[in-house]
């Protein structure tokens, strides 16, 4: 009887604590939805709706309220969903010192692959960002450009082998372009000729896909990792599957050993990491990287470059197939620039393809691969206006998908219109309203590389092939709701016709 009474008391205290925590926004008078006692405001994810769609709808519901954000709970985690452009700029840029960290899970001791530049916090992030920034200069991109072009040529050969000039062929294009991006990253990050364009079952790609789509514990514990990152770290939980950790550790160690032994230089991402590793080994930790730090950055370079660029290329081809006038205009630009540069793809030539860049930017507006940004308040944010107060430890969500589809910012947002990204149109819009790579000091460090490999790949494909919708093309597009990243459900099937060169 005493035990039963004790259980009742404990459960009552837990219910009281949960209700009190979930009542935070109501006590402050901040607009918010009704909170589920267990799931907070996230009960429809990951089974019914994509998390970015939940934040998008929240943005539209509360964007005209008197407050610059709306209250939200990710289970029991206090979250502020930004609805005001001025607050957005303060979070990402002006008051970045209050919002430096993302508040996501990483465990550098037990799960070294998780301790990436994207995830780590505080002084460690600042030091690592400073060390890695020179790796992504325009000069470094130019050095890696020939590698990207070489893989682009191989992709062209694969597409030609799969299409017939007289009638065309329906292809699932995301898988094919994913093999292109995997071979680019394999070359630039690991110095490997992965050969995945010719071997769809190549281990480098199959393990890579599993590293992105599979996590160690399944959906429920994944949610726990993201909802309670600090507690998960104390419990020594891991995010990445053991096969991925073992595979990439082996690949990176073998690559380092080979290049140090042979003194081979490839002017790629791995060369830069190895130079920093050598600094660490010689006692210069200020400019150096440990093996685990190098491993994590090589891994995130693969994951980010492989998934985001291939997904963006797939969505771009989908929109070009549905908008033949845009495709024709893009093909004309590519042909003109290609001819001007002696019928070669050059670094300078790709930079001249302004309409191609606009097509990619418009694709990323409609389909931002990471469609919401997170920051965490490291200290109380107490500006002059008390409405802007955000308490320490609050997760701040920037609903990029909502902003990208806001008709006050992008009129007729459902229409695919690359001209939105002319210099004049960009200047006429508020800043921080195009967010596929984030913004401010913690934006995506690999932006230039991602744009480069995406533009090169699309230039090869649009120059050589016509893409059209087919009966197998899914219209409207459906996205996979359980993933954090935006991706097409069941792939993207398009009719591909070979063009005369």
UniProtKB/Swiss-Prot annotation:
Obligatory cofactor(s): heme
**Binding of heme, residues:** 444
Q: Which UniProt keywords apply?
A: Endoplasmic reticulum, Heme, Iron, Membrane, Metal-binding, Microsome, Monooxygenase, Oxidoreductase
Q: In which broad location class does this protein mainly occur, judging by the first location in its UniProt entry?
A: endoplasmic reticulum
Any one Gene Ontology MF annotation carried by this entry is:
oxidoreductase activity, acting on paired donors, with incorporation or reduction of molecular oxygen
One Gene Ontology CC term in the entry:
endoplasmic reticulum membrane
Q: Transmembrane stretches, by residue range?
A: none
> Which cell locations does it reside in?
Endoplasmic reticulum membrane; Microsome membrane
Q: Topologically, how does it sit relative to the membrane?
A: Peripheral membrane protein
> For this protein, what is the EC number?
1.14.-.-
Top EC category: oxidoreductase
Keyword tRNA processing annotated: no
Where on the tree of life does the source sit, at the highest rank?
A: Eukaryota
- Which Gene Ontology biological process is one annotated for this entry? thermosensory behavior
Q: Which Pfam families match?
A: p450
Protein family according to the UniProt entry: Belongs to the cytochrome P450 family.
The record's listing under PANTHER family reads: CYTOCHROME P450 (PTHR24292), CYTOCHROME P450 6A16, ISOFORM B-RELATED (PTHR24292:SF100)
Q: What does this protein do?
A: May be involved in the metabolism of insect hormones and in the breakdown of synthetic insecticides.
> Which protein, by its recorded name, is this?
Probable cytochrome P450 6a17
Source organism lineage?
A: Eukaryota, Metazoa, Ecdysozoa, Arthropoda, Hexapoda
């Amino acid at each position: 009887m005493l035990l039963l009474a004790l259980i009742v008391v404990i459960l009552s205290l837990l219910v009281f604590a949960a209700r009190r925590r979930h009542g935070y926004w109501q006590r402050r008078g901040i607009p918010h939805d009704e909170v589920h006692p267990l799931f907070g405001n996230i009960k429809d994810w990951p089974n019914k709706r994509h998390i970015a769609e939940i934040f998008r709808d929240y943005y539209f519901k509360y964007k005209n309220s008197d407050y610059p954000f709306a209250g939200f709970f990710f289970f029991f985690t206090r979250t502020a969903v930004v609805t005001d452009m001025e607050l957005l700029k303060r979070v990402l840029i002006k008051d970045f010192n209050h919002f430096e960290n993302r508040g996501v899970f990483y465990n550098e001791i037990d799960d070294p692959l998780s301790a990436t530049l994207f995830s780590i916090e505080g002084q460690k992030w600042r030091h690592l960002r400073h060390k890695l920034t020179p790796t992504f200069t325009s000069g470094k991109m130019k050095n890696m450009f020939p590698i990207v072009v070489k893989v682009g040529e191989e992709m062209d050969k694969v597409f030609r082998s799969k299409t017939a000039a007289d009638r065309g062929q329906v292809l699932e294009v995301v898988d094919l372009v994913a093999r292109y991006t995997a071979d680019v990253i394999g070359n630039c990050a690991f110095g490997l000729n992965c050969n995945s364009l010719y071997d769809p079952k190549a281990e480098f790609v199959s393990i890579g896909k599993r590293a992105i789509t599979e996590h160690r514990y399944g959906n429920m514990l994944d949610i726990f990792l993201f909802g309670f990152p600090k507690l998960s770290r104390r419990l020594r939980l891991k995010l990445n599957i053991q096969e991925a950790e073992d595979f990439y550790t082996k690949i990176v160690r073998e690559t380092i050993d080979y290049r140090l032994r042979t003194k081979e230089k490839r002017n790629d991402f791995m060369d830069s990491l190895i130079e920093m590793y050598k600094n660490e080994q010689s006692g210069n930790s200020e400019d150096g990287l440990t093996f685990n730090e190098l491993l994590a950055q090589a891994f995130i370079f693969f994951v980010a470059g492989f998934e985001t660029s291939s997904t963006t290329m797939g969505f771009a081809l989908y929109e070009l197939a549905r908008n033949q006038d845009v495709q024709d205009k893009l093909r004309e630009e590519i042909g003109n620039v290609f001819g001007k540069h002696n019928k070669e793809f050059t670094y300078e030539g790709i930079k001249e393809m302004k309409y191609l860049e606009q097509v990619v930017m418009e694709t990323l507006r409609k389909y931002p691969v990471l469609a919401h940004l997170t920051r965490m308040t490291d200290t109380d944010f107490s500006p002059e206006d008390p409405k802007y107060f955000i308490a320490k430890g609050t997760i701040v969500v920037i609903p990029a998908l909502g902003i990208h589809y806001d008709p006050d910012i992008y009129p007729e947002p459902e229409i695919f219109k690359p001209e939105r990204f002319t210099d004049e149109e960009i200047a006429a819009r508020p800043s921080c309203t195009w967010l596929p790579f984030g913004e401010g000091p913690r934006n995506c460090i690999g932006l230039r590389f991602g744009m480069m490999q995406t533009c090169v790949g699309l230039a090869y494909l649009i120059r050589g092939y016509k893409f059209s919708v087919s009966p197998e093309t899914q219209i409207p597009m459906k996205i996979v709701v359980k993933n954090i990243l935006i991706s097409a459900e069941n792939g993207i099937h398009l009719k591909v016709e070979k063009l005369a060169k």
